[in-house]
Every structure is written in structure tokens, then in C-alpha cells.
Amino acid sequence: MQLSPSEISGLIKQRIEKFDNSVELKSEGTIVSVADGIVTIYGLNDVTAGEMIKLPGDVYGLALNLNTDSVGAVVLGDYEHIKEGDKAYCTGRILEVPVGEALLGRVVDALGNPIDGKGEVATDLTSPIEKIAPGVIWRKSVDQALQTGIKSIDSMVPIGRGQRELIIGDRQIGKTAIAVDTIINQKGTGVKCIYVAIGQKASTIANIVRQLEEYGAMEHTIIVAATASDSAALQYIAPYAGCSMGEYFRDRGQDALIVYDDLTKQAWAYRQISLLLRRPPGREAYPGDVFYLHSRLLERAARVNEEYVEKFTNGEVKGKTGSLTALPIIETQAGDISAFVPTNVISITDGQIFLETDLFNSGLRPAINPGNSVSRVGGAAQTKIIKKLGGGIRLALAQYRELEAFSQFASDLDEATRAQLNRGQRVTELLKQKQFSTLSVALMALSLYAADNGYLDNLEVSEVIPFESALHALAETKYSDVIAEINETDKYDADIADKLKIIVEDCKANQAW
């Protein structure tokens, strides 16, 4: 077979047209040391801060230290197979985690990989773990309540959607219990919840998952778990990963709640990483940027306006505001709230719920100290009826605390002082609440009305809780229409006050407790 010159030239032209001489440039470095989850890489010239670095064995590192001639990176995973002399490559990407509705009801690790044995997460959406918080122009003031269902919080330290409210106290005094109750109370409200467990035992996290499933709260909750057995790197990035998952809902005009349990352990993990990276230590051996560690995380919790949501969704969602409410938890040592990390987070957040060991041991649970606890913006978001009825509760407790210390020295007290002490004791008893027994707005208002109007004054202290239980049972059976009306409107006027009075007096007359 003989080809003509024209056919040969045609074939050559075709081959030239199809020839693809693409050159892929990769920045390559050499690992010069690996120890304690930290790799030092020489020769990565184009790496950026926070970039993912491809390491041997399908493992990635996070570039944290950019030196003149080397890069310090923390390994996100197992590093025992990595050795000196191995190659490392830039990826040009920063760390992203999966986001979206498909994550609801799932337990994932800090990188978004499922760890609950229910298969892969069915989402293609991802989001960077580090994002700039919305600016002032895109924010809206906090004016919608986020009901926790806990009397002492909703009446005295109200939380609004888009607020950052710190829960602070020693270990084992009910910080997580408050957060879990708040998540359970969001059932049916449309608020999506993210619970970030940092440095906790796997058994503790499994117990929380079981509790949320038992009370039907898991279907609106994502759990991000960086257990005590996970590396410091995963404990450090877990809150940022959880925040990105929450921002997915915020940016689409929905409401979300995120619990960081707890940021003390994240600060410990970051301190460990920083010391291993040879960063200069400061107060309590923390690095200089530990304030920025928490501020850049908590500033991402916000209420955003309609324009922000419309711009983010390219006009798909209009006329809706979004919010991400944060409940960071800080563990103190022997009640010392003046330590480095507690003071940092107190200054960043919009208020704090302070739990005290002495109150917990005396039987007051939740062990909230109303004197040290404050909500800086939640008052504007409080439901009308709770705001009206809760004012008297705070006043009664303030007077009680003042007189309680004085009464220990005074032998004969006048009638008015004795009445204030009696009411204070009964209000304190009323604020006791068992875990997993959150209240609706109407039932809470009923309890506060009874206390505010002196219906508890002639009861024994031991009768207060049984009376409240009987009052709620009566209201839910005989006066369910009133309860439904209050829950729907949350208004407080003379008509509602009269209806509450009828219910309380009916219960007092029955004496069925």
C-alpha cells in the first residue's frame, strides 16, 4: 500500500491538531522532619497560609508556619508512614468540608467524614472552614427569641437568634446539659442545630447522640466530633468545620444554632500545635494569637439581613433574614473566670451564663448564678409575655440575695423583709428544672405569673415544684386553648392576665398537688 504525499501531509496535520502538550506545574518539596504530627518541608515556595499540602499515603497537611526556607504543617490524619525525604506537593486549595441538608441527623468528624456507620453523606456541596464574617452593613439587629425552654435562662438571661452567649463554669456542673436541652427545645421551630464536641470521650459523645435520638432532636442536628483520641489538629479545626456547616443555613435565610463544647479544649489543642511549631509562648504558654483564634470563629455567628441572603443566593431567596446563634462553652478551673481564655471569650461574646459549683451542690439545677450572668442583646429579642412576667423574678432574686446575707446577722426582721426572703426562697425553688423537661412559652409564663403575683408565698418551699407540676397538668388538659393561644401569639395583655389568673386560682382551689 502506497500513500500519496497529500495524504501523508493530511495525516501529519491531523496529528499536529490533536497533539496536546499541556504542562502541569506542581510545587514540590521535600520533608526534612516529621514528629508529633508536625512536618517540616523544604522547597515549597508557592504555598499559602492555610493551604492543603499533599503528603504521602493520601494524607493532607495544613500549612501553618511559612518560614524563609521551610514550611511547618500539621498533619490531618495518621503520620506514622511519613518519613524524612518523602515528597510533598502544593494543592492550591484551602481546607473545605461538606455542607448541606444531607448532614442533618449524621455524626461526622472534623473533616466532614461520616463516623456513625450510616454510609456516605449524600452531598456534593463543600465550603471552606475559614471564612470572613459578614460585615456591619450585612448584619441585622437581634430581635427574635431563641427559646431554650429553661426558666432561669429565658426569663433572666434571654438569648436571641444571631447572638453569641457563653456558657461558663467548672467541670461536671451542667454546661452540656443546658446546651443539649436547648437543642431538644428547637424541635419543630425550624432551627437547625450543630453540636461540636471537642476533646471529649467517645462514650460521652455517643451518650449525647442517644439522648438527642430519644427526644427526636437528631433529625434537625449535625454532630461534629473531634474526640480526645483525635489529633490536636482535628480538635483545632473542628469548630471552624461546624461553623461552616451552620453558615450554609444562615446564608440561605434559615436559622441555625451551634454549640461549641468546649472552646477551652480547642485552645489547649492550638497551644500544643503552636508550641510544636516553635512559636513563641505568651501568657499561660498560649501563643500570641489565641484571642484571634476565638474571635474569628465567634464573629461568624450573626443575624444577616434580607439583602445579604438575596445576594448570596443570587435572588433565589428574597425577604428572609438568616441567623447563626452560637453557644460557646468554656470550662473554668475552680471558678476562676479571670484566667486567659475565659476573659478572652467573655469579651468576644454578647453575654454569659455563669454556672457555680456551690449552687449545683446545694441542689439548684441548672446552677445559674443570676448575679454574674448577663445577656447584652437578648432583652430586645425576648418574647413579650416572658419579658413582662420575668422582670419581677429578677427583682425578687436580687432582693433575696441582698437580704439573705444580711439576715444571717439580724435576729429580728420586720414583716416586709421576711416577706421578701420568703418569696426569694420560693422563686429560687421554682427555677429548679430537671434535664430534658423544657417548657413551652405558655407553661413558663404560667409559672412566672404564679410567682410574680404571690401565689407561691403561702406554700411550703417543698410544695413549690409539686404545685408547678399540677398547674402545668391542669393547664394542658382543661385550659389547652389558652396555652395554644399564648404559644401562638406570645402577647401579654389584661385578657391574657385574667386567663392566667383563672388557671392558677383553679389549681390553688383544687389542692391536688
Curated annotation (Swiss-Prot):
EC category name: translocase
Keyword Hydrolase tagged: no
Subcellular location: Cell inner membrane
Reaction catalysis annotation: ATP + H2O + 4 H(+)(in) = ADP + phosphate + 5 H(+)(out)
GO cellular component: plasma membrane; proton-transporting ATP synthase complex
InterPro entries in the cross-refs: ATP_synth_asu-like_sf, ATP_synth_asu_C, ATP_synth_asu_C_sf, ATP_synth_F1_a_nt-bd_dom, ATP_synth_F1_asu, ATPase_a/bsu_AS, ATPase_F1/V1/A1_a/bsu_N, ATPase_F1/V1/A1_a/bsu_N_sf
Superkingdom of source: Bacteria
Site feature (Required for activity) residues: 373
Pfam families: ATP-synt_ab, ATP-synt_ab_C, ATP-synt_ab_N
EC number: 7.1.2.2
Listed SUPFAM superfamilies: C-terminal domain of alpha and beta subunits of F1 ATP synthase, N-terminal domain of alpha and beta subunits of F1 ATP synthase, P-loop containing nucleoside triphosphate hydrolases
Membrane topology of this protein: Peripheral membrane protein
Keywords: ATP synthesis, ATP-binding, Cell inner membrane, Cell membrane, CF(1), Hydrogen ion transport, Ion transport, Membrane, Nucleotide-binding, Translocase, Transport
GO molecular function: ADP binding; ATP binding; proton-transporting ATP synthase activity, rotational mechanism
Binding residue positions for ATP: 169-176
Subunit-level organization: F-type ATPases have 2 components, CF(1) - the catalytic core - and CF(0) - the membrane proton channel. CF(1) has five subunits: alpha(3), beta(3), gamma(1), delta(1), epsilon(1). CF(0) has three main subunits: a(1), b(2) and c(9-12). The alpha and beta chains form an alternating ring which encloses part of the gamma chain. CF(1) is attached to CF(0) by a central stalk formed by the gamma and epsilon chains, while a peripheral stalk is formed by the delta and b chains.
NCBIfam families given in the database record: atpA, PRK13343.1
Role noted for this protein: Produces ATP from ADP in the presence of a proton gradient across the membrane. The alpha chain is a regulatory subunit.
UniProt similarity note: Belongs to the ATPase alpha/beta chains family.
UniProt name for this protein: ATP synthase subunit alpha
Lineage, top ranks: Bacteria, Pseudomonadati, Pseudomonadota, Gammaproteobacteria, Thiotrichales
